[in-house]
Amino acid sequence: KFVAGADTGKKVAVIGGGPAGMAGAYQLRRKGHAVTVFDDNKHLGGMMYYGIPGYRIPRDKLESENQRIVDMGVELRMETRIGRDVSVADLESEYDAILWAVGCQSGRGLFVEGWEETSNCVSGVAFLKAFNEGRMKVTADKVVCVGGGDTSIDVVSVARRLGHIEHTNPTDRPELVVRDGYVAHDAAVT
């Protein structure tokens, strides 16, 4: 069990309930500061919850670790967007400090002109977030994934679990492509 430090009388707003925000909340509570975490999402965890499939990071483990921090006396304001539901001016007047821990949630698009206007083309991050929120609507019979990093591999794994990948070439596996001691998954190979 985590233990909060002696009360300092200071209040800190933490914007973002992902790994950085929760680590910040933990450290601030250890120092004795009152902490309120604001997050736009329904669940804590940020990209660990919404960007990585649950079969890779079990939700019960993620939630129990976050709960250990909350149990230190962290107040939560979930489904609250700064700028829409609460103004920055309100935060500045109510709190002694603000920790911005909003993470990297946007993903990258294709380097192809006009891809944004394509109705069936989404970023890997948007695809995984829709899957993790339970609002996945795949209307195509096939999914094409451009890329070979961690996010791309998660997208392909989810698509395969959803039944949209029927055939893969046995040699198209990153662990089979090794150059200079690195697999293709670890480093770009040119």
Describe each region flagged by the PLM:
Residues K1-T36, D40-H43, M48-Y55, N66, ...:
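Fe-S ferredoxin-like electron-transfer domains
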Residues K11-F38, R77-S87, E92, S106-R108, ...:
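Rossmann-like dinucleotide/flavin-binding elements
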Residues D39, I69, L99, C121, ...:
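Conserved hydrophobic/aromatic pocket- or pore-lining residues that grip, position, or stack substrates
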Residues M47-D96, F111:
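N-terminal Rossmann-like dinucleotide/flavin-binding domain of flavoprotein oxidoreductases
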Residues M72, E116-E117, H185:
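Short, structured coil segments at secondary-structure junctions
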Residues A101-E117, C121-V122:
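Flavin (primarily FAD) binding-site architecture
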